[in-house]
Regions:
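Long, C-terminal catalytic modules of enzymes
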Residues: 143, 264, 268-358
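Conserved nucleotide-sugar donor-interacting segment of glycosyltransferase catalytic cores
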Residues: 21-76
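A donor-sugar binding/catalytic signature common to diverse glycosyltransferases
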Residues: 46, 219-266
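Gly/Ser/Thr-rich loops at beta-strand to alpha-helix junctions
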Residues: 40-47, 194-197, 241
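Donor nucleotide-activated moiety binding/catalytic core segment of transferases
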Residues: 13-30, 141-142, 168, 195-242
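Conserved catalytic-core segment of nucleotide-activated headgroup transferases in glycan assembly
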Residues: 113-205
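Active-site-proximal region of nucleotide-activated glycan assembly enzymes
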Residues: 52-128, 273, 280-285
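Conserved nucleotide-sugar donor-binding subdomain of glycosyltransferases
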Residues: 1-36, 109-126
Length: 358
């Protein structure tokens, strides 16, 4: 399901499972001399409950998120994402600010022209690549403000940051869709290009419920949306936030996100504020400074330290492939990679990263 149904009998099983994890984890940690715990995730009940109990007992907890080789959880930062609210303060202390911004500018411009960098290596194709339907119009061009909503995958961790205005992505969508008619805008929706297949049924149901809302093809190039003169972009915490802002587009976020320390996008703190800006787009006043976006980009994707090592942010970008379970040769290929010493530096890299966070 894309959101919680309090009448769903499966919810009871989830709660029982969570309680089982809680009491089992607590008993084990209280009766064994555990010093450190390594988790693949810091969210979802099978990981987050164990991690939080461990932290309450003074046990070190580590995760391996996308942005860092190693991330160390703390009681005041339980999520797997970097401490992005400190980005500005950290950057201010750097001596080569201009060089760092130059580095960001090159990579960011390459991304916006269709290249996939290591920061978005999870994308199968670039969302800014030119497509075969480039002559088709995105907006109706009816004189109304042009607004695009970028959907998230409904099943992909809506709570990886500290908080969000809505309980989940589905409630955000319902909130916006139910107000589109009153907004009186030229409105389009783009599904997430990497969304899980289960999203398709949800989207079809939304189309039936809101027949007047126009959905784009999920592979529509973001470049085309920008070129048609979009006035406002809606996202909860997506990378499109800083990418569209770099083109001077106003962006309305709906939750804590990596750009929260900066002022090039707008983040309301309540549903009431969010609704106000939806209904009054002309009241959104932003001073978008490209250098701020370049600074953010450097801190989020390129900066060394706090669990990130030299060589950018993805240690395992040695040989990018889709991990398809039907590919029976996948593990043989990994063994072949190891035989030519492609992974020899992995343990040294982890040691360096752990030293940084400890």
């Amino acid at each position: 399901e894309p959101t919680v149904d309090l009448e769903d009998k499966r919810l009871k099983n989830v709660l029982i499972n969570a309680l089982d994890i809680y009491f089992t984890s607590k008993e084990y940690l209280n009766n064994n001399n555990v010093k450190k715990i390594v988790l693949s995730h810091a969210v979802y009940i099978q990981y987050a409950i164990l991690g939080r109990i461990a932290l309450s007992l003074g046990i070190d907890v580590y995760t391996f998120p996308w942005e860092r080789v190693v991330h160390k959880l703390t009681s005041d930062h339980l999520v797997p994402t970097p401490r992005h609210l400190e980005y500005r303060e950290i950057f201010e202390k750097k001596s080569k600010k201009s060089d760092h911004k130059d580095q960001s500018r090159k990579i960011l411009n390459d991304r916006l022209n269709g290249q996939i960098d290591r920061g978005i290596a999870y994308m199968k194709t670039s969302p800014y690549a030119d497509t075969s339907d480039s002559n088709q119009k995105i907006f109706l061009n009816n004189g109304k403000p042009k607004v695009a909503l970028m959907m998230h995958c409904f099943y992909d961790a809506p709570h990886i940051y500290k908080d969000m205005i809505f309980e989940d992505f589905f409630e955000w969508i319902e909130f916006v869709f139910s107000r589109v008619e009153k907004m009186d805008v030229d409105f389009v929706v783009k599904p997430h290009p990497n969304a899980q297949p289960l999203n398709n049924e949800i989207i079809e149901n939304l189309k039936k419920k809101y027949p007047n809302i126009r959905f784009l093809n999920k592979n529509t190039s973001n470049k085309r949306i920008i070129l048609e003169g979009i006035d406002l972009l809606l996202t909860v915490y997506g990378t499109v936030g800083h990418e569209f802002a770099y083109h001077g587009v106003k962006v309305l976020m709906a939750g804590d996100n990596p750009t929260a320390a900066y002022n090039f996008s707008l983040l309301p703190s309540t549903k009431e504020q969010y609704e106000y800006y939806l209904m009054n787009i002309d009241k959104i006043e932003l001073t978008i400074n490209k250098e701020d976006i370049e600074e953010f980009f450097y801190m989020h994707y390129l900066d060394i330290g706090d669990g990130r090592i030299e060589g950018n942010n993805d240690l395992f970008f040695v040989r990018k492939r889709d991990y398809d379970p039907s590919n029976k040769n996948m593990f043989i290929e990994l063994i072949d990679d190891a035989s030519v010493k492609k992974f020899d530096s992995v343990f040294d890299s982890f040691s360096k990263a752990i030293e940084q966070v400890d």
